[in-house]
Each structure stands twice: as structure tokens, then as C-alpha cells.
Amino acid sequence: MNAPVNLSSDAHKAVMNDVLQRQKAAHLRDGPPSAEKRIQWLNRCIDLLVGHQAEIAKAVNQDFGSRSPEATSLTDVAGSIGPLKHAREHLTKWMKPEKHKTTPAILGLFGAKATVQWQPKGVVGVISPWNFPVNLTFAPLAGVFAAGNRAMIKPSEFTPATSDLLKAMFAKAFNEEEVAVFVGGPEVGQAFSGLAFDHLVFTGATSVAKHVMRAAAENLVPVTLELGGKSPVILSRGADMATAAARVMNGKTLNAGQICLAPDYVLAPQEDVEAFVKEAQAAVSRYFPTIKDNPDYTAVVAQRHYDRVKGYVDDARAKGARVIEINPAGEDLSQQEHRKIPPTLILDPTDDMKVMQEEIFGPVLPVKGYKTVDEAVDYVNAHDRPLALYWFGTDEAEKDRVLERTTSGGVTVNDVIFHVAQENLPFGGIGPAGMGAYHGYDGFREFSHRKAVFQQLKKDIAPMLGLRPPYGEGIRKYLAGQIKK
């Protein structure tokens, strides 16, 4: 639903809280949904994506100014259907109680049982971002619905056409007691994050996440925060530079680098920096013979983000960096209908440059040389823990050393970003890059309450062990057996 306009944050909160209370009441009234009901919810989501593919591509293109339908279908549509299908296929197995051994084990021999029962939390709030506005709404819902929850969604105000479309889509397939969408600006988001959800998922900037977490803390709402950071690429001396550059630049130019997992900077052996630059230029020329009117090359979403990314380049240039714009056709991009920034390499970057201090979130890639791989590891560890780390090479011992000595949300070896597509792996950050994880079974677990259930023996053995007053020799023997090394 649309959040009413011209309302205070408190008024917005009251409107949304009414829906929240109705969803919670419906959850209690209906009880935990069956596997069939959960599959029905997932199927409705899949049907929405399949049936609105063209409309989604049109809306996203309108919001970005230029993004090809193929890019949107790949990342936002197909990228959402995959997780939903995976959850649909496996949720019946996931829902089964998890059997555990009893403590002490002898209790189990006589019939006692210890299990974990997976219980829906209730109502989950989802705050989705602008960079993949459809995928980062539907992908969390795969776990939310598999776990048997209802959902309230606040899509980004920076992609208004897509947000309005999402609102209309969900209204066609779900009633408000199942899913409700609220569209609006920061005041709506502020009110939304302060609701007493049973769980809240936020995907976006670390700076905003602090406000979201603070608001959620007022109601002790557990949160999953999917944030970002400066995800490094470490190129080993054994890396194939042509392959590495092609894969890094593919990840860096996808959605014009507006991806939380985009490679943020490259650490390369000093003697290989120029080879990487040459191969990066060749790869971009293959991918994008032209940029200005090429729909395959995505625009930056808004003027303030365009100015921010251009500001990083200007700051680096002013502080002595070598700046290489990869513009295969030599087009004049100073006057253009859309906000396109060509892939840009920043060589000889220093830590006083903004491009090395802040997440870039655009098609700009600093390349920094190193003498030893330990130097590269130390550089990564001297900064905030990133959402992802990428290593390219053939030396298994070096790979293991890098992965053991660095901490990141996830890792892809010999490519970038692809670990996010693995539904059998958790996706999440650590530290400033986020907390919690979802995707596949991990999403089911994240959005479920793990209820511990112990079923005692029918026969009362406590008196036999002397565990009840008045205490005597029986309990002393029992304790003597327990309190020892």
C-alpha cells in the first residue's frame, strides 16, 4: 500500500503498525502455515516475476535512466526466481524437527528425546535497496516464506517506478495479512524501521544501517543487516592476468559497479600492475565497444551518486594518482542524456584519497601494487572487514593462507561475486559489512525460531539418582561422578 502523504513519522508509524498488528493477529489465528501454504506463497512470487518481466525491466530502466532489459532480467528477475525455486524444492525437508542426542546419553537409550522445532517468527520486515530493487526484495522472501512468516516491505525511494510496480504486483497476489508494501521517502523508512517486527532485514549502506539498528533496538527486534564495504581482489603471482582482468572487470561493470559485492580495489604484484591494466582495457573493449548509447552499460542511478563517484576520481587525480578511463570509442561523455561514467582505473592510489577510504559503488577501480602477498594481507586486515574477498591464482598454499588470515563475509576464488549465487552457502557480512546471513537453508534458519524441546522419560528417575530433597548419599555419588576432570 502507499504510505499516506504529508504525515509525520509518528502518523506513518501508526498506519503501518495497524497492518503489523493485523498480520500478527492473522499469524496467531491461523497458526504455523503448512508446507503446502508456504509453497503456494513462493509460487505466487515466481508467478509475479514471470508475468511482469517486461514491466520490471521498463520500470528499472526508467529509474536508472539506462539499464538493459537483459541486465534486469539476469539480476533482478532470474536472480530472484532461483532462490524462490530452491526454497520451494527443499522447505519440506527443512521444516522437519532436528533430532539431537540427549545429555546424558543414557536418557536417550530409555526413550527421552531432544529436538529442535522450527517455528515461524511471525512478521518479518524487509527494507530493500535501489541497486537491485526487485532481487533484494524477493530473495529475502524466499527464506521468509519458507520459514512460514508474513512480510511487510519498504522498497527504496530512489527507484520510485520500481517501488510502485512492486506495490501493485504484491497487491494482485497477496492480501495485506500476508504481504504489505509501503512506498515513500525517508520518513516512511524511519517509521518502518521502528515497528515491533519479529525480525527485520535491511539491505543498504552501513551509515543507514546504524539508524535502522538503533530504531529496531527500541523493540529488541532481531536484525539481519546486509551492507557492503571495500571488497578487495588479491591477484597472486600465479594468476592468469587475462582471465583475472576479464572476470574482475565483468564484476566491476555489472550494474556500473553499483553492487555491494563489486570488487572495490585490486592488490596486484608490482610487476603485474601494467599487465592487469592492459588486460582490463581489452576486456572492457570487448564487453562495451561503445558506452554512451549502449543499453548494456548501466547508468548511475542518481545525480548525487554520479557526483560522488566523479568526486572520487577528481580527488585521486588531484592527489597524484594516474587515472585511466576505459572509453573504447573515445566518446564525449561530458554532455549526455544519462549519467554514465566509463570504467576508470586509479593507479598508484594512496590512503589519503577518498577512493581508498569509502565504498565506491560505481565503475571506478583502484589498482595498488604489492611486494609480497603478506603485505597484501596486512593491507586488507588494516581496514574494516569487507563483505567479500576475491583471490586469483593457482598456489593452493597461498590461497589457504590468505583465506585463513583475512576475515570477510564471503569469498570467491578465481572469480568475483559468484558466491552470492550459491543457494547452499550462507550470504552475509561481518562487522561493518553486516550481521546475520540468509540464502537457502541459512535463510530458513535465520527467519525461524529454533525452539528447543526436551521430552522426558515416562519413568521418574530423579529419585533414583537422589536429585530431589532430602539429599543424601545418592546425590553425593552422582555429583562425585560429574565433578571430575
UniProtKB/Swiss-Prot annotation:
It catalyses: (E)-coniferaldehyde + NADP(+) + H2O = (E)-ferulate + NADPH + 2 H(+); (E)-coniferaldehyde + NAD(+) + H2O = (E)-ferulate + NADH + 2 H(+). Gene3D superfamilies: Aldehyde Dehydrogenase, Chain A, domain 1, Aldehyde Dehydrogenase, Chain A, domain 2. The active site is at E226, C260. SUPFAM superfamilies: ALDH-like. The keyword 4Fe-4S does not apply. It holds the Pfam family Aldedh. Belongs to the aldehyde dehydrogenase family. One of its GO terms (biological process) is aldehyde metabolic process. Keywords: NAD, Oxidoreductase. The gene is calB. This is Probable coniferyl aldehyde dehydrogenase. It is an enzyme of class 1 (oxidoreductase). Coiled coil: none annotated. GO terms for molecular function: aldehyde dehydrogenase (NAD+) activity; coniferyl-aldehyde dehydrogenase [NAD(P)+] activity. One of its GO terms (cellular component) is cytoplasm. It comes from Caulobacter vibrioides (strain ATCC 19089 / CIP 103742 / CB 15).
